[in-house]
Amino acid sequence: MNTGDPYGIPQDNPFVGREGLDEIYAYGLRNPYRMSFDRAGEYGLFAVDAGEHLWEEISIIIEGGNYGWNVKEGTHCFDAANPTEPPEQCPDIVGLNHPNQGKALIDPVVEFVNAKQPDGLGVNVTDGFLYRGTALSDLQGHLVFSMWSRNPTEPQGRLFYALPAATGLWQMGELTPGQPVDGSVGHFILGMGQDAGGELYIATSDERTPVGQTGRVYKLIPR
């Protein structure tokens, strides 16, 4: 029987030796639903972070980074007492007695409007990978990511892409008919996967909950 610690904690984690859990690597995230590493190592670790009311986001995670929740949702100010009406001002730096105190809160590289807004793109970002495969040459070096569904009741998952930028938000678009992949998926998209060659897959279901036998895995291939 192993009665010792069930895992190790890197001694350079930002909260080691100070108030807070030693396990914490980054914070200020609302619901980091999935994470993935750039297999080429250029951008490191991505986290898709499901928003509360207005914005979905994807961030690049760094050691000790504070991503602003719950004073920011995406790049926008957030008020937990009134989540549908962003305040005009909010903190923009890390507070005292926190790792990286005095440094700027970290904004996402991708954000888009949630379906709870009139012009929302969909319900919950579910996964994303920096594409390093070869089959979809036009998407090489782009972040490909998934949306659970266009609306909360119908299986209308969607796929998007974002082009990395040196600063600010990455330019994004939807994968639609006529593009390398038709991203208008007639299923709920539960998540994505990546194989040893960098090619991408999506896991889907036609049910909103884990029932039935409609689960499928699809590989993204050129049209």
What are these model-derived regions, one by one?
Residues 1-175, 187, 210-215:
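Beta-propeller domain segments
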Residues 166, 175-198:
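C-terminal structured "cap/appendage" subdomains that terminate the fold
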Residues 193-223:
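Blade-level signature of beta-propeller repeat domains, shared across WD40, Kelch, NHL, RCC1
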